[in-house]
Amino acid sequence: MKKSVWHHSLKGYCGRIAAVLCFSVLVPLVAMAAEGGGHGEEGTDWVNFGWRVLDFIILVGLFYWLLASKVKSFFSGRREEIKTTLEEARLAKEAAEHKFKEYSEKLDKASKEIEGVYEMIRAQGQAEKEKILEDARKAAAKMKEDTQARIEQELKKASQQLRMEAVQLSVHVAEDILKRNITPEDHQSMVKDYLDKVVRKH
């Protein structure tokens, strides 16, 4: 948009200069032709022509003096404007690259944080799984120990009961021996029979 406006302004100035120059050249020539046609017998008035050429040169110099500064300032202004535009474009490009780099770093950081959270969740899941298995192993070991303790306690209780019954049996047998006056062989047979009954019972 700016480039087209600049070209349009430049063309306008050049067109004006060309029109002025053409006008300055054509006017003296037409005047000379008209004057020569009217006085063909006298020939060309070179003095008059010289003054007209001098007027033309002065006029061209005047126009150059009036327009040169404007044309120069115009091109100088356009040069500064183009320089400013290029500088703004460069700064905008650097800002865009900086923003892109900043967003890329934020994206990489977010990706690493998400990966870290995923690893933490997976580690927690693994730790929870191992904790559950460890608790199950401990519970099974405790159950086994409790069962073993109950069995040992029952065996101990049964052994004590058998001893008490054996003592009672010996007392009864002794009483029977004293009452019946049986032989020792009979005593052993009676004890054996009683023990067999107790074993079958338990």
UniProtKB/Swiss-Prot annotation:
PANTHER family: ATP SYNTHASE SUBUNIT B (PTHR33445:SF1), ATP SYNTHASE SUBUNIT B', CHLOROPLASTIC (PTHR33445). GO terms for molecular function: proton-transporting ATP synthase activity, rotational mechanism; proton-transporting ATPase activity, rotational mechanism. This is ATP synthase subunit b 1. Belongs to the ATPase B chain family. It comes from Syntrophus aciditrophicus (strain SB). F(1)F(0) ATP synthase produces ATP from ADP in the presence of a proton or sodium gradient. F-type ATPases consist of two structural domains, F(1) containing the extramembraneous catalytic core and F(0) containing the membrane proton channel, linked together by a central stalk and a peripheral stalk. During catalysis, ATP synthesis in the catalytic domain of F(1) is coupled via a rotary mechanism of the central stalk subunits to proton translocation. Pfam families: ATP-synt_B. The chain crosses the membrane at residues 17-37.
